[in-house]
């Protein structure tokens, strides 16, 4: 039986967070945050079962070539010292699915609910062979176009849309 877990949070500089550090942790990799000059290395972790970036077709290729490129650009274009740089969530994946279907389910959910609305989704799959298969997803807060990031879309902060996102996952999973 699937266990429902989906909780949205924000990466906030005012809380000492950086989207680059969060991305490095999720993707179990090593990324240097160009803004602060600090390197975050989680490559020793062994529970990663795949990683993908999903982006609108209008997103410039140089921004979506890697998590490092994406989140360093997000940090670069956020001008506020106490700014918010990403939305993120963890989602429990039904254990009954095979690993390919687990990945497909999360990717389809992210495409439908976020990427098709203009966000970039950075997805890391963890512990797919365990009793706790889950994905970590980071989402951009600003619109993306051929020229790069635009303004933040404040409608994405509406509690009603977050309820819709949760309902969508409950229906799809």
Where are these regions (language model features)?
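N-terminal nicking endonuclease/strand-transfer module with a His-rich metal-binding environment
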Residues: 1-173
């Amino acid at each position: 039986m699937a266990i429902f877990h989906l909780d949205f949070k924000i990466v906030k500089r005012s809380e000492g967070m950086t989207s680059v550090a969060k991305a490095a942790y999720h993707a179990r990799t090593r990324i240097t945050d160009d803004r602060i000059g600090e390197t975050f290395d989680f490559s020793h972790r062994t529970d990663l079962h795949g990683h993908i970036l999903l982006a609108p077709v209008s997103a410039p290729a140089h921004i979506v070539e890697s998590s490092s490129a994406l989140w360093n650009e997000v940090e670069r274009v956020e001008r506020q010292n106490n700014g918010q740089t990403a939305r993120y969530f963890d989602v429990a994946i039904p254990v009954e699915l095979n690993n390919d279907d687990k990945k497909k389910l999360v990717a389809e959910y992210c495409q439908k609910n976020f990427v098709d609305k203009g966000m970039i989704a950075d997805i890391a799959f963890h512990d797919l062979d365990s009793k706790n298969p889950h994905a970590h997803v980071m989402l951009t807060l600003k619109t993306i176009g051929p020229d790069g990031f635009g303004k933040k879309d404040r409608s994405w902060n509406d509690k009603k849309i977050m309820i819709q996102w949760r309902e969508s996952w409950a229906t799809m999973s």
